[in-house]
């Protein structure tokens, strides 16, 4: 079994916060992949399901962010899991919005939710780092992550959540590369194979315009042959 933990704060007040993007991600996975209804357990809410043959328990701690480790530790001990069976989904201010990275182990980088998890299960767990951008100064970080996403963020946020849901089976199998590819296909879909680079379009447009000008240009009219004698030409000149 794998334990996937979505970090966030409980309550409607925090539901749309940047700090709650981890909750949003596991909610989307549960909804799209037919997981069981959420139920209260382990100082949080849990939902069980299967992703490509892998049993996964989703957990949303309701302890508030700074005590998330209590919930994670309790669930891990109950199922006799190792910390390497745990994947934590969390907001990441050091990544631009819509950027995602998968990481195995490491520090908590000042993230209070990760700090709490470190204290209860150690640092050797996996993370899905969900970029939300940085406010520009460290003093503004608390207010920034505890604020709702802007309306302008709705498009990329929906793409990211769809992408992580698409890629969830790959992540469950341990293929982080395919997981990230699935996200990328939602966030930055490839150009159509029939589309042409802009420069090529411009060159073709210019060539076509030149061809059209050439076709529509009226050639000069031919002058009739002058059959007059020299005497007639001289007489006509002085008329």
Swiss-Prot record:
Compartment(s) of residence: Cytoplasm
Principal localisation: cytoplasm
Composition-biased stretches (Basic and acidic residues): 198-239
Class in the EC hierarchy, top level: hydrolase
Keyword set includes Metal-binding: no
One CC-aspect GO term: cytoplasm
Keywords per UniProt: Cytoplasm, Hydrolase, RNA-binding, tRNA-binding
SUPFAM superfamilies, alphabetized: Peptidyl-tRNA hydrolase-like
Active site per UniProt: 19
Region (Disordered): 188-239
UniProt-annotated binding residues for tRNA: 14, 64, 66, 112
Enzyme Commission designation: 3.1.1.29
Residues of the site described as Discriminates between blocked and unblocked aminoacyl-tRNA: 9
Site, Stabilizes the basic form of H active site to accept a proton: residue positions: 91
Matching PROSITE patterns: PEPT_TRNA_HYDROL_1, PEPT_TRNA_HYDROL_2
Pfam short name (any one): Pept_tRNA_hydro
GO BP annotations listed: protein quality control for misfolded or incompletely synthesized proteins; rescue of stalled ribosome
Catalysed transformations (reactions): an N-acyl-L-alpha-aminoacyl-tRNA + H2O = an N-acyl-L-amino acid + a tRNA + H(+)
GO molecular function, one term: tRNA binding
Stated role: Hydrolyzes ribosome-free peptidyl-tRNAs (with 1 or more amino acids incorporated), which drop off the ribosome during protein synthesis, or as a result of ribosome stalling.
Record family assignment: Belongs to the PTH family.
PANTHER family: PEPTIDYL-TRNA HYDROLASE
Assembly description: Monomer.
Protein name, as recorded: Peptidyl-tRNA hydrolase
Species for this entry: Jannaschia sp. (strain CCS1)
Encoding gene (name): pth
């Amino acid at each position: 079994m794998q334990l996937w933990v979505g970090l966030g704060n409980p309550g409607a007040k925090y539901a749309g916060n940047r700090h709650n993007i981890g909750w949003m991600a596991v909610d989307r996975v549960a909804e799209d992949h037919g997981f069981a209804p959420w139920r209260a357990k382990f100082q949080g809410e849990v939902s069980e399901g299967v992703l490509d043959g892998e049993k996964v328990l989703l957990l949303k701690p309701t302890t508030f962010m700074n005590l998330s480790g209590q919930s994670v530790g309790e669930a891990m001990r109950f199922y006799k899991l190792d910390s390497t069976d745990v994947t934590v989904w969390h907001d990441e201010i050091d990544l631009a919005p819509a950027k995602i990275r998968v990481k195995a182990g490491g520090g908590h980088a000042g993230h209070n939710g990760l700090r709490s998890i470190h204290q209860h299960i150690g640092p050797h767990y996996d993370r899905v780092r969900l970029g939300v951008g940085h406010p520009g100064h460290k003093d503004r970080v608390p207010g920034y992550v505890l604020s709702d996403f802007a309306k302008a963020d709705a498009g990329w946020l929906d793409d990211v959540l769809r992408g992580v849901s698409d890629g969830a089976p790959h992540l469950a199998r341990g293929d982080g590369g395919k997981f990230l590819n699935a996200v990328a296909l939602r966030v930055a879909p490839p150009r159509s194979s029939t589309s042409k680079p802009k420069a090529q379009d411009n060159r073709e447009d210019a060539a076509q315009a030149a061809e059209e000008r050439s076709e529509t240009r009226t050639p000069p009219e031919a002058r009739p042959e002058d059959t007059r004698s020299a005497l007639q030409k001289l007489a006509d000149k002085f008329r």
